[in-house]
Amino acid sequence: MARSPTSVMISSLLLLLLIGPASSDDAAAAAAARTSTGGVAGDELALLSFKSSLLHQGGLSLASWNTSGHGQHCTWVGVVCGRRRRRHPHRVVKLLLRSSNLSGIISPSLGNLSFLRELDLSDNYLSGEIPPELSRLSRLQLLELSGNSIQGSIPAAIGACTKLTSLDLSHNQLRGMIPREIGASLKHLSNLYLHTNGLSGEIPSALGNLTSLQYFDLSCNRLSGAIPSSLGQLSSSLLTMNLRQNNLSGMIPNSIWNLSSLRAFSVSENKLGGMIPTNAFKTLHLLEVIDMGTNRFYGKIPASVANASHLTQLQIDGNLFSGIITSGFGRLRNLTTLYLWRNLFQTREQEDWGFISDLTNCSKLQTLDLGENNLGGVLPNSFSNLSTSLSFLALDLNKITGSIPKDIGNLIGLQHLYLCNNNFRGSLPSSLGRLRNLGILVAYENNLSGSIPLAIGNLTELNILLLGTNKFSGWIPYTLSNLTNLLSLGLSTNNLSGPIPSELFNIQTLSIMINVSKNNLEGSIPQEIGHLKNLVEFHAESNRLSGKIPNTLGDCQLLRYLYLQNNLLSGSIPSALGQLKGLETLDLSSNNLSGQIPTSLADITMLHSLNLSFNSFMGEVPTIGAFADASGISIQGNAKLCGGIPDLHLPRCCPLLENRKHFPVLPISVSLVAALAILSSLYLLITWHKRTKKGAPSRTSMKGHPLVSYSQLVKATDGFAPTNLLGSGSFGSVYKGKLNIQDHVAVKVLKLENPKALKSFTAECEALRNMRHRNLVKIVTICSSIDNRGNDFKAIVYDFMPSGSLEDWIHPETNDPADQRHLNLHRRVTILLDVACALDYLHRHGPEPVVHCDVKSSNVLLDSDMVAHVGDFGLARILVDGTSLIQQSTSSMGFRGTIGYAAPEYGVGHIASTHGDIYSYGILVLEIVTGKRPTDSTFRPDLGLRQYVELGLHGRVTDVVDTKLILDSENWLNSTNNSPCRRITECIVSLLRLGLSCSQVLPLSRTPTGDIIDELNAIKQNLSGLFPVCEGASLEF
């Protein structure tokens, strides 16, 4: 006899009671596995089994899920049951647990919820595979599993859910082919989102049978082959088709151009080619967005584009389009974005610029990028009549001549203006002063002349002003001091004269660079330069500057590059330059400097390049610090120098004669004895005072992290033996140790003599006390005590990371081939993904938002499985409502992070933000791909890591890629018939572009962590399955 639902419920409850509360979830799982009984009780058991399969149950989200009686599961969080008046009350019809912080696998038991219509588990941390049992949900209409870490393939059995209208499996780690069953059986599907996975193979032609489809997104996968022509048979109500960032090839089928309902169409970043049919846009009247960038399309822009009258974005950059730009844009009254850069467009005659007059009818135009083409001739005055909404205008890297339109100041909405690398002549129009919203003005490498207009001082929002390599003359305008948001100023290689205006150094925001080199500037360097405490680069070489080097340069604490060579400077080198602890390059050559070389320069540990040649220095050359390496210093042309290391080949210095007979030994000896007695008394008094406090308990503790004693740490580290020293920094030293509670640990002993070390200790404890993530270094315990001398002692004990830091792997110190470490490309991408996940957790998913403030390769530690863990939270900031919890003034807060990695806005005292971490992460991405530190000595002041990569992307990518990744870069890049090699190239290019996108100057322009993770997952999946050796190239991955 069949059992009733009530008896099933009672039996299940008795089973749970007999087993006991502690194993209730396991009991539910077992019961669900042993029975296929349906009904209300079956629904409850299926839900409890699902709960038991989770590793993390979302805190309070599933707290209500327990065996509480018939039908009570309908009150559980996320559970929706059918109405009581209906035929089947208490049956689960919806399970909605989006963003519930769940982790674990999706239990097959959910396949028993036979009345389920909607299942939404998106934006959690679920893993494992999609259970085929879900195909039993014959009533299912909505299945959303996006934003998890689900692996495996899409089960073909999903085709049995024939009532599905929405299927979203995006942002996971799915692999394999797209089942043809989706197209063959899911006739009611209106939404299909499979993007941002690792799906491969061809797009099934059966997808063309989805006659109800409205939203279709397969982007960011590894799909290959041609676009099926059957997709042109899709629903007449299809709104979006997104196929970007795959490996699709061939031409766009003509049938696609007949999808008259289409609103958005994207195929960018593929290998598609061919010409666009002349009538392609004839029926696409509703099209709003078309993105075909970074492909191999050629020919002309079809005139039929004018028929797409609703078009807002047209992006065809990075192709081989050529000829004259069409003049049909004037009918696109809703156009906001036009990307034509990096093509082969040309303008031979003045009438070829007619499309600009056409664009003046586009009153909503915001972005116009014509850079990197073959545009020539003179700009028409109609440029000044473009929309006042235009915020981005790029004409760089063309062959444009003539003058800049005098009324360009009419474009009052401009925020970015790129005119560099052309042949512009004449003067800068004074109307530029009307562009009050302008943030970036780049016009270097032209033939501009005349004086720099005073009206430039009206651009108070300007961040970047680069006018170098032109023919400007006259004085540097004093009105530049009005640019109170300026970060970088480049005026090099012009004919400027007069003094450097002292007002320039009152711009407190100037932090990236001042470059006034290679001009005819005169006078002295203003003392006010010391106001720029955050300045990184100062170039004033090759001028006619005279007078002394100002002592105040020593106040520019963040200065890394100082170039003053080829001037008329006199006097001695101020010893204050020794305060510039981050200085890497100092060039004072070819001046009239004299006196001794100050020994303080030897204390600058970062100084790798020092040029003092062709001056009149005298006396002994130091032998330590920068002076210990002859390859990094140049001192020729100073005839009166002596001493130094042997490699300098200088004469020995004559020792001074000592007159010991008249040396006042006795008075000095008595004074020393007295001083020592006083100091000893003070020491005993201080020690006694500290020991009286020893019994008082320390207030420094962390919930869940019991304190450990000083004596335990002494024992664990063999008395902090030098053999156990792992590394040392400004705030502390790290030792390897062994505690009873852990096999091996890392013990960070704070250097409390540094006043900032205690703040570092507090910040790290505060930031990590409630943090739990697989990619964060775990704190084992802490110690806040007194050492055996009565001094305060503080230490943090972490999990030991046996594989060392990422810095050790990217920049190994040893040159012994037998001891070289190698990270292949796939491993590097995995490490970057680990770090991105850690930052995503800190910024968005932790108990409270935390900004790390010091993301760099030495703070990324690797465990025995090479999983990356972000550590060293000594500079971290907890945010409350997006604002740093620890509010300090600019002067007291100082500079955050490490030179080279720190965001430029930190240099001007901005509050810590997640955008700053993203900038540092971007630099880390570039470092891990290029193998170069951001402070590499090969970089010039005008060519940092970002510029170095940008040049590589515009030229030969192999020139900037770490040589450890390429054994034969020439064959690799030119191996056009080798698909795996092309894919590796694409992955590296994508990584470099990601690094540049994350490290943009403007904080709000940087890529958010969620998008970073999506991009890295796509890159990682694109690398999977490649052969380890490519024909014509040997690569690691």
Curated annotation (Swiss-Prot):
The modification Phosphothreonine is found at residues 700, 717. Residues 1-24 form the signal peptide. LRR repeats lie at residues 89-112, 113-137, 138-161, 163-185, 187-210, 211-234, 236-259, 260-283, 285-308, 310-331, 333-355, 362-385, 387-411, 412-435, 437-459, 460-482, 483-507, 509-532, 533-556, 557-580, 581-604, 606-629. Residues 687-1037 are cytoplasmic. Glycans are attached at residues 66, 101, 112, 209, 247, 258, 307, 334, 361, 385, 447, 458, 482, 495, 515, 592, 611. Undergoes protein cleavage upon X.oryzae pv. oryzae protein Ax21 detection, thus releasing the processed protein kinase Xa21 chain. Autophosphorylated on serine and threonine residues; these phosphorylation prevents proteolytic degradation. The active site is at residue 854. Its EC number is 2.7.11.1. Enzymatic activity is fifteen time stronger with Mn(2+) than with Mg(2+). It is an enzyme of class 2 (transferase). This is Receptor kinase-like protein Xa21.
